[in-house]
Every structure is written in C-alpha cells, then in structure tokens.
Design a protein with these regions (language model features):
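Glycine-rich, charge-dense phosphate/pyrophosphate-binding loop(s)
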Residues: 46-50, 56, 158, 162
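Acidic-glycine-rich active-site phosphate/pyrophosphate-binding loop
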Residues: 1-3, 30-48, 117-119
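Phosphate-handling active-site elements
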Residues: 34-44, 72-91
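C-terminal binding/interaction regions
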Residues: 89-162
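Polybasic, low-complexity association/targeting segments
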Residues: 1-18
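Glycine/serine-rich anion-binding loops at beta->alpha junctions
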Residues: 49-68
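Short cysteine clusters
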Residues: 23, 60, 108
Length: 162
C-alpha cells in the first residue's frame, strides 16, 4: 500500500457517515494494513485513544494509534525486544516532533480547541463537520510523515553495535 492508497483508506474509514471509527482506530487499521501487521481490520486496541485518550484531550489519537502500530512493526522487524523498544521510541519521537512542527501541538485539545468530555462542545464539533477537515488532515499528516520516516533505513532498524 503506497502513501496515497493509505490516505484513501483512511478517508474511507474516518469519513464514513456512520462515524464508526475515530482518529486512533483509523490510523491503526491503515498502518496495520500498509505494513502487513496482524489483524488489520481489528482496531480494538486503539478505540480508547480517540479524543486524546478517552476524550481527555491529551495525545492526538492519530499519534496514539501510530504509536501502537510502530510498536508492533518494531517488534516484528527487530528480534531483540530491548532494541525494538529503543527504535520504536526514537521513531515515535521523530514523528511527534515533525507533527508538532506542522500542526503546532500534539495534544487533541490544543489541536481542536474542544473539551470532548463536555457533551455540548463535542456535539457542536461533530455537527460542525470540523473533524472531517481538521482531524482528517492530522491523520493524513501522520500517514505522510510515517511514509518518509519508515522509508529511512536508519529508522526502525536496529542500531549497529559501537
């Protein structure tokens, strides 16, 4: 799956009128499919990450879903578990830095201006359709950034012993 196909898949999941999948679930499914990770159609592990982790406004769900997929990917590509953790963290830090540079924040509340725990604010946000552009744009950013980061041979590869 190339970058454009991943974006098309993400739009199909996220922008579905039933609003079945949130930001974290969408990115998690797309990345699992793109990188041939187990059970790409099951986004269950990511469902509580939407809205900045259980609507708390913390880490953007697209980044949270990406973190889950990166951990799985590193675990499959790097046999040594400790090394896989180092590499996954390094890659995630780069992703977060690049995302922050492009969007000015990594926290959902800062990115959206919404307290999702407030039912009125949440409803207005959904009804406004702003999630279709703002959140979808952030999902697309994560896909694009990971495409670049994961194509770099130095990332998501074990470090050479010194």
């Amino acid at each position: 799956m190339n970058q454009q196909q991943a974006i098309v898949a993400a739009r199909r999941y996220f922008l579905d009128d039933a609003n079945h999948y949130g930001c974290a679930e969408t990115i998690y499914m797309v990345l699992k499919e793109a990188y041939r990770l187990p059970e790409p159609a099951d986004p269950s592990a990511a469902m509580v990450l939407n809205g900045g982790i259980a609507y708390s406004g913390n880490l953007c769900g697209a980044l949270g879903g990406a973190a889950l997929a990166l951990g799985m990917l590193a675990g499959r590509r790097i046999a040594d578990h400790k090394q896989a953790k180092v590499v996954a963290r390094r890659t995630m830090m780069r992703l977060m830095d690049e995302f922050q540079a492009q969007h000015g924040a990594t926290n959902c509340r800062d990115l959206t201006g919404i307290d999702f725990r407030d039912e009125k604010q949440h409803r207005r946000f959904i009804e406004s359709g702003l999630w279709r552009t703002r959140c979808m744009g952030q999902i697309e950013t994560v896909i694009r950034l990971l495409d670049v980061l994961l194509s770099s041979p130095s990332l998501l590869a074990p470090e050479e012993p010194s």
